[in-house]
């Protein structure tokens, strides 16, 4: 055997002996219970680091420019907005932000008003004098025959004059004047475009927790979208072509009032036809309509579609949140019941995980335009497992408003 090979063999034996001695030391001092606890904690930490460094790292490091071009320039687009209430504040503020977008190609905004207020509809039509590219369509409200968002969107898509469609809602406003430009240019690299939607920043801890929850939930589907396994997008900020829409005969799951941004997308999304706009100026900002009760109700309502998600997507979410929860519980067990040096080791593992988590959260926040993330993130990190547990428990009961 050559001298170098002998030296490597001796080094391997030395390392193996040291490892065995260390394991024997742990077993002798902490018993099999302590050894098992240590192994479980290390395994859970490894799972957590894999998700936050590798899986979510794809979001932070994603570059849409690496995807193949299918168009040489941004296309003409139609922005579809369903409207189910007489929100005069929307006409005075958020609609102006939509109409004032800077976009090199022609664009139109199609508002589908579902209601019975003729004065409001007239006000909408009067806006066309100021904005010639505004198209207004009305569906008469009838309490005996409720109109769903999908039905309103279908009318809007048929009314649109352009092939490329962008869907948003009256609850959201663009983060910048370049929102439409960012989304439109993304059509150059895919027939489906996905954008991020933030929650409107406000003062207070509740708003912070809701904002971080939105970012975390979005990270789940963004991580799969950038890895060419799209299963959903933001209902306030996504686009597709008319050809794709009519190619599958429109929206599915018509017995549900939700699903346009996930169940429909699952039918049309392929590995090579999705473009992801991950820049702050391409985001939308959703208005926060309430506190934590509103947010949990929001998760419950749209969580009705969760059962129809691909197994791989559901398993990934549950493994991540499950491993986080178990890691916290095993670490707490170590901190309460184990000797001082074991407690110190558990604390080091907790700190190691948190550093990885907060650094990744900050890098993703930078990509999507979320601000003020890092300093209070430990609060959300502790609270999130409980919030997700409550959301899963609530999903065991059917939300009748999500079904027709």
Predicted feature residues:
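N-terminal membrane-anchoring/stem segments of glycan-assembly enzymes
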Residues: 15-71, 361, 388
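Membrane-embedded multi-pass helical conduit in multi-pass membrane proteins
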Residues: 71, 321-400
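Cell-envelope/extracellular polymer assembly enzymes that use nucleotide-activated donors
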Residues: 76-78, 108
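Acidic donor-binding segment of Leloir-type glycosyltransferases
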Residues: 95-143
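Long helical/loop segments within the catalytic core of UDP-sugar-dependent glycosyltransferases
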Residues: 131-138, 143-148, 152, 156, ...
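Short aromatic/hydrophobic "clamp" motif used to bind/position activated sugar donors
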Residues: 165
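Acidic donor-binding/catalytic loop of UDP-sugar-dependent glycosyltransferases
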Residues: 170-185
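Catalytic donor/gating beta->alpha subdomain of glycosyltransferases that bind UDP-sugars
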Residues: 192-217, 246, 252-316
């Amino acid at each position: 055997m050559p001298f170098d090979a002998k030296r490597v063999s001796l080094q391997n034996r030395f390392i193996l002996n040291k490892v065995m001695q260390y394991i024997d030391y742990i077993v002798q001092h902490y018993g099999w219970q302590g050894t098992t606890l240590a192994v479980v904690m290390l395994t859970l930490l490894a799972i957590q680091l894999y998700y936050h460094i590798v899986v979510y790292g794809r979001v932070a490091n994603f570059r849409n420019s690496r995807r193949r071009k299918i168009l040489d320039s941004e296309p003409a687009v139609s922005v579809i907005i369903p409207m189910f209430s007489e929100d005069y504040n929307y006409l005075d503020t958020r609609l102006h932000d939509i109409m004032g977008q800077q976009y090199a190609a022609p664009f139109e905004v199609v508002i589908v008003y579902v209601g019975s207020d003729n004065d409001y509809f007239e006000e909408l039509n009067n806006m066309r004098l100021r904005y010639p590219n505004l198209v207004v369509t009305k569906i008469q409200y009838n309490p005996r025959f409720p109109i769903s968002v999908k039905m309103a969107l279908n009318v809007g898509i048929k009314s649109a004059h352009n092939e490329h469609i962008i869907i948003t809602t009256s609850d959201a406003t663009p983060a910048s004047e370049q929102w439409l430009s960012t989304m439109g240019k993304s059509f150059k690299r895919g027939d489906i475009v996905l954008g991020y939607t933030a929650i409107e920043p406000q003062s207070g801890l509740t708003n912070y927790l809701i904002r971080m929850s939105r970012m975390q939930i979005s990270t789940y589907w963004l991580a799969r979208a950038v890895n060419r396994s799209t299963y959903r997008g933001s209902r306030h900020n996504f686009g597709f072509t008319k050809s794709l829409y009519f190619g599958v005969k429109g929206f599915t799951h018509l017995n549900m009032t939700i699903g346009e941004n996930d169940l429909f997308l699952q039918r049309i999304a392929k590995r090579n036809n999705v473009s992801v706009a991950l820049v702050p100026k391409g985001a939308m900002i959703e208005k926060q309509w309430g506190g934590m009760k509103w947010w949990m109700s929001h998760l419950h309502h749209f969580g009705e579609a969760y059962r129809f998600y691909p197994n791989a997507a559901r398993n990934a979410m549950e493994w991540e949140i499950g491993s986080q929860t178990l890691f916290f519980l095993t670490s707490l067990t170590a901190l309460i019941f184990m000797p001082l040096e074991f407690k110190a080791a558990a604390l080091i593992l907790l700190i190691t995980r948190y550093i990885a988590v907060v650094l990744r959260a900050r890098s993703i926040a930078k990509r999507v335009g979320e601000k003020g993330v890092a300093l209070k993130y430990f609060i959300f990190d502790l609270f999130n497992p409980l919030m997700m547990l409550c959301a899963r428990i609530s999903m065991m009961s059917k939300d009748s408003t999500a079904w027709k």
